[in-house]
């Protein structure tokens, strides 16, 4: 597989074309951002940890029947993925109140949500990733009603699989975001799954083990990521 020119550079990953029109290379960088890219720092080992963490999670999801873009690891910081036609919508599943939900509704952080909540946000940093609903997605042509049904089904399946996986490792899966795209007509899970895009708390102490450590200035960000990976058995 030949790596070619950079196609896209995001806040923490770079995407490269390959000699296969259906495949891309994701490069996980050490960049760490918060507040829609307004704060960016370099954290040693972060790209490696997130790349291998993502590979582990995507493989677990594939085994559970969730189609993903992940193909294989290429190195410490790179993986090969399917080239998706991305849907510009973030699906957020929440099992406990945290983050923007607490700010929007004034709910106490850590409140158990039973059942979980499912939310949609437009993927647009310039607009602050606004909260949207299903009718917006269809009306503005960001996706179809059928695609939304499948995205929700897969989000719920991901929640079922990963809630148990993290629980077995002594962790609470507080919330997470997912992005989907289309590959040869099929809705497929894209982007990544790492502590950058979810909230994980220690089940006993409620210690935060995710990017909130960076957002809130708690320190030991990568140490927390590595502890989560080690609890899950991710080979780093």
Curated annotation (Swiss-Prot):
**Can you supply a Gene Ontology BP term from the record?**
cobalamin biosynthetic process
Q: What class of enzyme is it?
A: ligase
GO MF, any single term: ATP binding
Q: InterPro entries, alphabetically?
A: SAICAR_synt/ADE2_N, SAICAR_synt_PurC, SAICAR_synth, SAICAR_synthetase, SAICAR_synthetase_CS
Q: What superkingdom does the record give?
A: Bacteria
Q: In which pathway does it act?
A: Purine metabolism; IMP biosynthesis via de novo pathway; 5-amino-1-(5-phospho-D-ribosyl)imidazole-4-carboxamide from 5-amino-1-(5-phospho-D-ribosyl)imidazole-4-carboxylate: step 1/2
Assigned EC number: 6.3.2.6
Cite a single Pfam family from the UniProt record: SAICAR_synt
Write down the chemical reaction(s) this protein catalyses. Answer: 5-amino-1-(5-phospho-D-ribosyl)imidazole-4-carboxylate + L-aspartate + ATP = (2S)-2-[5-amino-1-(5-phospho-beta-D-ribosyl)imidazole-4-carboxamido]succinate + ADP + phosphate + 2 H(+)
GO cellular component assignments: cytosol
**HAMAP family to which the protein is assigned, alphabetical:** SAICAR_synth
User: Which NCBIfam families does the protein's record reference?
Assistant: purC
PANTHER family, from UniProt? Answer: MULTIFUNCTIONAL PROTEIN ADE2, SI:DKEY-6E2.2
Q: Which family is this sequence assigned to?
A: Belongs to the SAICAR synthetase family.
Protein name per Swiss-Prot or TrEMBL:
Phosphoribosylaminoimidazole-succinocarboxamide synthase
């Amino acid at each position: 597989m030949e790596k070619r020119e950079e196609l896209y550079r995001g806040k923490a990953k770079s995407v490269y074309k390959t000699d296969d029109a259906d495949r891309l290379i994701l490069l996980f960088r050490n960049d760490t951002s918060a507040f829609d890219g307004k704060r960016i720092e370099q954290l040693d080992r972060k790209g490696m940890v997130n790349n291998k963490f993502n590979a582990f999670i995507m493989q677990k999801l594939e085994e559970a029947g969730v189609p993903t873009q992940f193909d294989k690891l290429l190195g410490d910081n790179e993986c090969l993925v399917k080239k998706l036609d991305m849907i510009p919508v973030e699906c957020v599943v929440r099992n406990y109140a945290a983050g923007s939900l607490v700010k929007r509704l004034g709910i106490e952080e850590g409140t158990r949500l039973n059942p979980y909540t499912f939310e949609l946000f437009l993927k647009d940093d310039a607009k602050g990733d606004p909260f949207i609903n299903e009718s917006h997605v269809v009306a503005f042509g960001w996706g179809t009603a059928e695609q939304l049904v499948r995205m929700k089904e897969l989000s719920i399946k991901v929640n079922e699989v990963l809630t148990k996986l993290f629980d077995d490792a002594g962790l609470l899966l507080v919330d997470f975001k997912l992005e989907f795209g289309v590959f040869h007509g099929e809705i497929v899970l894209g982007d990544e799954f790492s502590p950058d895009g979810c909230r994980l708390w220690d089940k006993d102490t409620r210690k935060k083990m995710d990017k909130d450590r960076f957002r809130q200035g708690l320190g030991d960000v990568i140490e927390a990521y590595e502890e989560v990976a080690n609890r899950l058995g991710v080979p780093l």
